[in-house]
Regions:
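Sec-dependent N-terminal signal peptides
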Residues: 20-21, 25, 50-52
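Signature for phosphate-centric chemistry
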Residues: 63-248, 252-431, 435-523
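Ala/Thr-enriched low-complexity intrinsically disordered regions
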Residues: 4, 9, 18-21, 43
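Fungal secretory targeting signals
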Residues: 1, 43-63
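Cationic, low-complexity basic patches in intrinsically disordered or flexible, solvent-exposed regions
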Residues: 14
């Protein structure tokens, strides 16, 4: 609501011009003062409220109409209703909306923007839409899921009927003392000893479960090439050669993100081939990117309405899938009482999609080779998995609060990075974060994506910060296209005032994440 003195001015057009000008000036100054908590951190290099700082803010406010956003809308806004989150379509439907689950290469008959679980669409030159030349790109932050991998050991069947070989790649693990050390390039080779009487869980063969596969490493390298093709090739924004003072890469404590990083970095900068390249990583107990810091309140919220909950709107799809579970269990050998496999479809989804992405046969029973999971069965699993992620991270009204606690620290880091560029204190122009589906899902949840999906392999969100006439704007790309938020305060995130995004993040988690510890400890 506008202050009374602002409303009064609308009816005083007939009064003396001097009086009207004075009232208008006072109105502007008061609105500016009320906006200072948002303006100071987001637009100016001010460390404290001083006369000089106020003058600088006044100047910017006069130049930009985007520095005084309305109060951020912190409400949860429902995603669009589609076949993804329609329970009837999920249970009784066929196919998976044209989504791809069996190749990294999206067929020429499909648009590149088509959902491809094995290798999701990302920014690349062929589809990239440049903004007007009036806008100058100042900063880019990329966050994406790792690329395709073997399934987690916990998601393999008690007895797999064929082996899985990873002899087409090498995974290196070694250390080097600094500054005067060297090392042999040590890589792991999985083997089975005839003198070891125990059989490995899941697949026999030469893979770790999980590890990024050889195909996944190739996808990772191409991802790096595609990003460089846009941000250097098209826009001449990135440095020609790798410069660690301007370009930063970050991984989580899960080694599969480092496996991806090795190829992404080389795909962007060939000079890094076989050369030491530093990536950033936070301590395992407080890693905000994975995320791995303890947030008991968020965990309690998720379990109150999602996986393991007894909430009717969660269990409805599980109860309607009893016959599907029975078929899957008869092939896999998983016990019907195993809650990990039956309180959601995550385990079956990971197992079956990993096979298909690597051109492996869908499984048959170890005791009856004619009893097999069909592609129709797999599609039924995939529909339910997509439904679950939409429900957990968007459809439930509790999802915004849960995701804010669980991923709020990364959001505060993103805001700090944007401010550092805007106020001139941070020389880094490009940050690249390699994360997980849980990271991307929570980010999309907080930004309130209008159509939620399970983020597939390589799923990518890009934040582009632009300046025009000393005003700052943000463009957010999801899968290479402008993101649409169900929250009208964010809306279509195409060159919106960055002050809107910063105000939204600040209101949720506080500057530098100061609200997150309290959010995570709330009962």
């Amino acid at each position: 609501m506008l202050p009374t003195f602002l409303i009064v001015t609308q009816g005083m057009q007939h009064k003396g011009p001097a009086l009207l000008a004075l009232i208008s000036l006072l109105s502007s100054l008061i609105v500016l003062y009320l906006s200072l908590p948002i303006l100071l951190p987001s637009t100016m290099p001010c460390k404290s409220v001083s006369a000089v700082c106020l003058a600088a803010v006044s100047m910017v406010a006069a130049q930009c109409n985007n520095t005084m956003p309305a109060a951020a809308d912190l409400g949860w806004h429902a995603p669009n209703m589609t076949a993804i989150n329609n329970l009837t379509a999920v249970v009784n439907g066929t196919g998976v909306l044209g989504f791809i689950f069996n190749t990294s290469a999206t067929p020429a008959t499909s648009s590149y923007s088509t959902y491809n679980w094995c290798n999701m669409p990302h920014v690349r030159a062929q589809e990239y839409v440049s903004v007007s030349k009036d806008y100058q790109l100042k900063y880019v932050e990329v966050i994406h899921r790792h690329h395709k991998r073997t399934p987690y050991a916990s998601n393999t069947f008690p007895h797999e009927t064929y082996s899985w070989s990873c002899d087409d790649e090498a995974l290196f693990y070694y250390g080097t003392p600094i500054p005067d050390g060297t090392a042999a390039q040590i890589n792991w080779k999985v083997f089975n000893s005839p003198a070891n009487p125990f059989a490995p869980a899941g697949f026999n063969g030469t893979c770790q479960f999980p590890q990024i596969t050889g195909q996944g490493l190739n996808d990772s390298r191409q991802h790096g090439k595609d990003l460089y093709g846009v941000y250097y090739g098209l826009l001449k924004f990135l440095p020609t050669e790798y410069d660690s003072s301007k370009v930063k890469y970050r991984v989580t404590n899960n080694v599969i993100t480092s496996q991806v990083a090795g190829e992404v970095v080389e795909g962007m900068y060939l000079s890094t081939t076989n050369n030491p390249t530093q990536v950033l990583i936070q301590p395992a107990s407080i890693d905000s990117l994975e995320p791995a810091y303890t947030c008991s309140a968020a965990s309690a919220q998720y379990s109150s309405y999602g996986v393991s909950s007894k909430a009717a709107n969660w269990t409805a799809h599980l109860n309607a899938s009893a016959s599907l579970f029975a078929k899957l269990d008869s092939v896999s050998g998983v016990n019907a009482s195993d809650s990990g496999w039956h309180n959601w479809f995550d385990h079956y989804f990971d197992n079956l999609s990993a096979r298909l992405c690597h051109s492996k046969a869908l499984p048959c029973s170890s005791s009856n080779s004619s009893n097999c999971i069909t592609y129709t069965d797999a599609e039924a699993v995939f529909r339910r998995g997509e439904y679950e992620y939409s429900f957990i991270y968007r459809d439930s009204p509790a999802s915004l609060a849960a995701s804010t606690g669980a991923f709020g620290v990364y959001m505060s880091e993103l805001a700090a990075n944007l401010r550092g560029v805007m106020n001139g204190s941070d020389p880094v122009i490009y940050r690249h974060n390699i994360a997980h589906d849980g990271s991307i899902s929570r980010l999309l949840s907080i930004l309130q994506l209008d159509v939620m999906v399970w983020p597939g392999m390589g799923s990518e969100v890009v934040f582009e910060l632009y300046e025009k006439s000393q005003c700052w704007y943000i463009r957010v790309l999801w899968g290479g296209q402008v993101m649409r938020s169900s929250n009208p305060y964010l809306g279509r995130m195409d060159l919106v005032p960055v002050s809107n995004l910063l105000a939204y993040i600040d209101a949720l988690v506080g500057v530098n994440g100061v609200k997150v510890p309290r959010l995570c400890s709330a009962s």
